[in-house]
Amino acid sequence: MGKKRSREEAQKEVVQNDPTVDKMDEDSDSSDSDEDMDIINVDFELFNYDKDIDFHGVKTLLRQLFDADAQLFDLSGLSDMIIEQNTIGSTCKVDDKANDAYAFLTVLNAWEHREKKPVAQLIEYLSDKAVKAGDSSLSVLPELFTSGKAQVGIVLSERLINMPAEVIPPMWNMMIEEIQDAVDDKEPYEFTHYLVVSRAYVEVESSLDQEEQKRKRLRDEKGLQYFHPEDEEMRKHAVGAGTYTFTKEGDSADSKRAFQELGVKSQGFMMLIEAGRFKQAVKAIGDCIGAAN
């Protein structure tokens, strides 16, 4: 393996969000409390993974990414693997490297790590879900995973739900550069395909209403929505994409009822992108998010 690259202080990517955080006046007795607010500018910085700092932050975000099925994976082992390849992908933090990650992005070589438990679990799980995802183009995934001729990069990315989308293009652009540097160093990152693992959701009638509407058994599912706006753009460049039901799915819609009139049914979501179209997909993310702001 070639010499690992590192991003030092001068190379850190700084993402300025101007502004992102609203600090509301906490005096609920004041008639003006709902209108008064202070604007806080927040700088987000990208860092290499650090084994002494990032384990718990990455593991927490992985648990969020895999949702109800997080219990099916060795998340500790997967977190260790992500952190060990510390020059591929980034964490996004506020203020200081020592803080927990607000977001992370990485890619794992499925073939290279196929015999390691965390990746073996991922391959088995994603192969099964790909067949059930409702897109015939994803049915090739099990074969791609088991063929040494195909090199599938499993892309894992997650962030706190209130993170601004502006942090995403720099993370993806930096990873593209790092992958190319790794390939130049003869490291195993020359992929034929990228499998982006994410989440989506649909709005559904909460089962809390069932007592009042016993005769109405069908749930009213609205259109598919994306937790990550970049997924909608990236999907346009995928050869296959689809959602899947979590194996350990619970009634997650009811747990979120307090925040909106309808429940939220979270689903797994995956996109298979050929390597030749991946850079174009990443560029489209930047174009889309930039145009929206």
From Swiss-Prot:
Compartmental location: Cytoplasm; Nucleus
Function: Involved in nuclear export, actin cytoskeleton organization and vesicular transport.
InterPro entries for this protein: BCP1_family
Family per similarity comment: Belongs to the BCP1 family.
Acidic residues compositional bias, start-end: 24-35
Record lineage: Eukaryota, Fungi, Dikarya, Ascomycota, Pezizomycotina
One GO location term (cellular component): cytoplasm
Native species: Neurospora crassa (strain ATCC 24698 / 74-OR23-1A / CBS 708.71 / DSM 1257 / FGSC 987)
Protein's name according to its UniProt entry: Protein bcp-1
Basic and acidic residues compositional bias, start-end: 1-12
GO biological process, one term: protein transport
Keywords: Cytoplasm, Nucleus, Protein transport, Transport
Positions of the UniProt region annotated as Disordered: 1-35
